[in-house]
């Protein structure tokens, strides 16, 4: 579930779950069956083990600190895998930290890109499930667990590090999802500022105006790094410069969590 959206996102109405209409919709039985088959057929490396943490959902940091986290989803979809290197280049050029949530099957197809992302200390990598399903619609808890565990294994095999942060696809979750993530050692991370970059009307100018007008202390912004047609990369330099001009410090989600809960172990990635 998501907190109801209180505003019109760009020019597109939000659903009650807080997601844009263009980003929602349940998969057909055929698509769901294909996702099940993909997950079952994947040759999984050994799954890493993290100590369990208390079930926790984070959607923003402290409101009394002008810190903001830029996050990017690399979604696993039915379409061929994509990677927008311009997003990475914009972040590196601005020396901007970011948290990037990797889909497991996306990571399996984009091996070189995942390794490159992991090579930059300013980037924090998280888990975005293996096949990008609607998790609350999954009746079998073992399938929810498999989506997370399989991605943990994939990222660990490629980077040598195990994510401690988890973002459910489509911003959809229920108490089972948060609990299972905690049992696997991950904090569930949502957001309070959807950029709207998947929307067809989301031009560079609209993305910049929207993010800068809605940014608040502690905000977690969500964008995407897996689609070449989005205007995310074009907007990023102005978004980053605008946030800094307004006095914001860019941080990772892990740093936001540390400020909320000093000493938290559920931050960043584990060896």
What would you call each of these model-derived segments?
Residues 11-13:
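C-terminal motif of bacterial Sec signal peptides marking the signal peptidase cleavage site
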Residues 15-18:
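Bacterial signal peptide processing site
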Residues 22-50:
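Post-signal peptide N-terminal segment of mature Sec-exported envelope proteins
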Residues 42-127, 131-139, 147-154:
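Active-site beta->alpha N-cap acidic-glycine motif
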Residues 50, 57-63, 230-271:
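C-terminal domain-boundary segment and adjacent tail
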Residues 74-78, 104-108, 130-135, 170-175, ...:
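Solvent-exposed loop/turn segments at secondary-structure junctions
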Residues 89-102, 124, 141-174, 179, ...:
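CE4/NodB-like, metal-dependent polysaccharide N-deacetylase domain
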Residues 172, 178-214, 247-259:
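His/Asp/Glu-enriched short active-site or ligand-binding loop at hydrolase and phosphoryl-transfer sites
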